[in-house]
A protein has these predicted regions:
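Carbohydrate-interacting/catalytic domains
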Residues: 1-39, 49-53, 63-122, 126-171, ...
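Hydrophobic residues within beta-strands of alpha/beta enzymes
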Residues: 77, 196, 340-342, 457, ...
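Short glycine-biased active-site loop of nucleotidyltransferases that positions the nucleotide triphosphate
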Residues: 91-92, 213, 350-355, 399-406, ...
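Short, flexible loop/turn elements at secondary-structure junctions
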Residues: 94, 190-192, 202, 216, ...
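Substrate-binding/active-site clefts of carbohydrate-active enzymes
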Residues: 258-262, 282-295, 304-486, 785
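Conserved alpha/beta catalytic core and glycan-binding cleft of carbohydrate-active enzymes
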Residues: 264-265, 453-455, 470-638, 643, ...
């Protein structure tokens, strides 16, 4: 006698209602296979009805097996019993699509698959057979959950998110026809949610269909969906539907640890195998720790990928990651930069944010291609011997509802009080005091270093993290427990971030954009510092651009703005930035900031670059500066490459290339960039003539470079400076050379001409001077120079004789 088709069901009505209503927080207690003790009467019918029904069963029944499933779009659902290959139809016990099959003759679990027949979009039918997602055991290990809960899971992306995996058959202890099942393992942190579901085209975005299991130890929800359900794996669109416990909160969320997302304005996450790319940068990685030391040259080309170059013939579209690799790598290599720095490539919904309002902390933006495409981009730079630094934004995140904000119906990632709102950018501020949030951010940083082989991270808006009163008026903030304005939780996070990153990935660079005088930013945490490797020298940038924007007639009144930076140049490990922030929002381009007529504008820009490359500190130049772009930077259009048809713009580009070459090849210009032993004034008092001179020392003192700067358009004849050694001093670079668009004024004689084209009165080739045994400016020797207008001249002794 068969009882599969009987109208009697065993699932309690409240459980059926919870699943159908979308508020079931423990789906594994309801769905899937269950052994039911029918003697308890805890079924879908009363005890009396159950006893009456069981009286008709021709054998004793105390325990039975049920299989339950919820498929609201199914026309029929059946169970295939794998040990007998019997197909048993399931009974629809709720019109919304709750199905149940009761196996009265069985008392122990058995292997099975579900067969679901649904209507298709074209009016036909489609049938899928698969292992029940609710037949699989626990997915994440207890150790993983322990690390997540204590905030120390630094490979978080390997357990959370969506992963293509092959799991052992859920019936490995039975006679299962397969050893493993391929599919996608989903996991997300949402400790305060009532329910979290995986949704996508595979379940018509209905959050009731695939609710997840809650692992209360760490507040993580997990579910494995076989490939047969999903209709594939890689490239699959999905989101998490999060139902909160309070206020009827129901929201579709992108995966916080997703590796790939749709191009805005769409926002679904995309399943991607993050580990399949095969790298070809072993040589670079093996020597990275050596080439990224403080005593090595670091010259950075800052790039916004969406506007470096576009394709006007195709609707002004972006270049892809692979197209950028083909064009940008040889360009950066030719220009002599050692590194590029990318404005944030993490996924972000708003183009106007330039990438600084991130929703995908584990995903390169899909605007330019896939994660593998971006890996290929980084790989190409490494094979060319160029490092890649990524801008990374742990200070704040946007309020877009598909992102992190109010993720589980509570302030999960953000502070829930006044600290949670950023007054400048109208964004949310991470809760740096919560262990799981700190873990999320540290894991994100490590993700880019491990998975994408980034060589460093530049941390944006560090100052906004350090101070509780940042951009807040009195009454809008509260002091810390000591009565100060220091954000103690953020400071502790920054220190921990730098400690972990340097321990896990030796040799990478951590760079701070910190705009205040916070002490010891680039000192180790064990001596009280924040632990960064470098800090942007915003003071140098501000003072230098202010000085160069002045008419040369008035520069003598602002001489201190030029020289002040040397008072603190070695208090931190500095990078000198001429960044994207200085060429937008009405500030004008670098060329546009320069005073004077057309020739003087270009001469001033050449002098600015010469002074920057001569000044102690690593270098950073935003794209467009090297071609003397007239316009401010526009994120929505390409750089004005057509300007290179004019000699003046070619000259600036040629100068930047040669400055990089000189910086890389002359130890004096980089070995002691961050050490006071590498710099010594010759004379900084000549404010009346706006002339300064100094020595850049190398570790081998014989390789020193003397730098002389004339920041007026007046040629200074017979200008004497002291030098440390006798012998012949040769120009190794002069920003006034004609090949750069300058006047060609010779430092050693009369008339004009390019380097090496004429002979001066002394008999030396133009560009060379002989030191005289005439003490000057506390030096035993001196040279007599002709200083070209608006120029910076680099001199090096030709021989090592003393």
């Amino acid at each position: 006698m068969e009882f599969h088709g009987n109208p009697f069901y065993l699932t309690p009505p409240d459980q059926v209602a919870a699943v159908c209503g979308g508020y079931c927080s423990d789906p594994f207690a309801v769905l899937g296979m269950h052994v039911v003790d029918v003697g308890t009467g805890d079924t879908g019918h009363g005890a009396g009805e159950l006893a009456k029904f069981l009286s008709h069963v021709p054998y004793p029944v105390s325990r039975v097996v049920t299989v339950r499933a919820f498929y609201p779009f199914a026309e029929s659902v059946s169970v295939r019993v794998l040990d007998t290959n019997e197909v048993v139809p399931m009974q629809r016990i709720h019109p919304d699509g709750f199905f149940e099959a009761v196996f009265w003759e069985r008392s122990e679990p058995f292997p099975y698959r579900l067969i679901v027949t649904e209507g298709t979009r074209d009016g036909g039918q489609g049938t899928r057979e698969f292992y029940d997602p609710y037949s699989f055991p626990l997915l994440l290990s207890d150790f993983d959950l322990h690390l997540i809960a204590e905030g120390n899971h630094f490979r978080l992306w390997q357990v959370l998110g969506a992963h293509i995996v092959e799991l052992p058959s859920p019936f490995a202890n039975h006679q299962s026809p397969v050893a493993s099942v391929r599919g996608v393992r989903f996991a997300v942190w949402a400790p305060n949610a009532l329910r979290v579901s995986v949704v996508g085209d595979f379940n018509r975005w209905d959050g009731r269909v695939h609710p997840m299991r809650f692992r209360h130890e760490a507040g993580v929800w997990e579910l494995f969906l076989p490939e047969e359900i999903l209709g594939g794996t890689e490239g699959l669109l999905y989101k998490f539907e999060v139902k909160g416990r309070y206020g009827g909160y129901l929201q579709l969320k992108a995966d916080p640890v997703g590796f790939y997302h749709e191009v805005r304005p769409k926002s679904a996450s995309i399943v991607w195998d993050i580990g399949r790319y095969r790298w070809n940068d072993d040589e670079w990685l093996s020597r990275r720790q050596e080439v990224q030391r403080l005593d090595k040259p670091v010259s950075i080309y800052e790039v916004h990928l969406g506007s470096w170059r576009r394709v006007p013939e195709e609707g002004n579209r972006w270049l892809t990651y692979r197209e950028l690799a083909e064009q940008l790598v040889p360009y950066v290599k030719d220009m002599g930069f050692t590194h590029i720095e990318l404005l944030p490539v993490m996924e972000h919904p708003l183009d106007e944010s330039w990438g600084y309002q991130v929703t995908g902390y584990f995903a390169p933006t899909s605007r330019y291609g896939t994660p593998d495409d971006f890996k290929s981009f980084v790989d190409a730079f490494h094979q060319a011997g160029i490092g890649v630094i990524l801008d990374w934004v742990p200070a704040h995140f946007p309020k877009d509802m598909h992102g992190l904000v109010f993720f589980d119906g509570t302030n999960l990632y953000e502070y829930g009080d006044w600290r949670g709102d950023h007054p400048d950018w109208h964004t949310k501020v991470f809760n740096f005091g919560r262990t799981e949030v700190r873990n999320f951010l540290i894991a994100s940083a490590l993700f880019w270093l491990h998975e994408f082989h980034a060589d460093g991270l530049r941390i944006d808006a560090v100052a906004s993290m350090l101070y509780l009163d940042y951009s807040r008026k009195p009454g809008e903030w509260q002091p810390n427990i000591y009565g100060g304005n220091e954000h103690l939780e953020a400071i502790d996070f920054i220190k921990r971030l730098n400690e972990v990153v340097h321990e896990q990935v030796p040799g990478i660079l951590m760079v701070a954009e910190e705009s205040t005088a916070w002490p010891m930013v680039t000192r180790p945490t064990y001596v009280g510092g924040l632990g960064f490797d470098f800090k942007w020298n915003m003071g140098w940038m501000h003072d230098t651009l202010f000085y160069f924007s002045q008419d040369p007639i008035f520069r003598k009144y602002h001489h201190g703005a030029l020289t002040f930076s040397l008072w603190y140049a070695f208090s931190e490990n500095f990078i000198l930035p001429l960044s994207h922030d200085e060429v937008v929002h009405g500030k004008a381009s670098l060329l546009g900031k320069m005073p004077g007529d057309l020739w003087q504008k270009f001469a001033n820009l050449r002098a600015l670059f010469g002074y920057m490359w001569a000044h102690p500190g690593k270098k950073l130049l935003f794209m467009g500066g090297e071609i003397a772009q007239w316009r401010e930077w526009d994120y929505a259009s390409s750089l004005d490459w057509h300007l290179l048809q004019w000699e003046s713009h070619q000259g600036i580009q040629r100068l930047v290339r040669d400055l990089n070459w000189l910086y890389r090849t002359e130890p004096a210009l980089h070995e002691w960039d961050c050490d006071h032993r590498g710099f010594e004034w010759i004379d900084f008092h000549d404010a009346d003539h706006s002339v300064v001179s100094f020595i850049r020392w190398a570790k081998d003192w014989r390789d020193c470079i003397v730098v002389v700067c004339n920041f007026t358009p007046v040629v200074r004849h017979d200008y004497r400076i002291g030098v440390p050694f006798n012998g012949v001093w040769r120009e190794v670079l002069n920003t006034d050379w004609q090949q750069y668009g300058g006047s060609g004024t010779r430092v050693a004689g009369q008339g004009t001409g390019d380097k090496g084209q004429a002979t001066g009165e002394s008999g030396w080739e133009a560009g060379e001077v002989v030191a005289e045994a005439l003490p000057w400016q506390n030096r035993p020797y001196s040279v007599r120079l002709t200083l070209p207008p608006l120029s910076v001249v680099f001199l090096k002794r030709c021989t090592h004789t003393t």
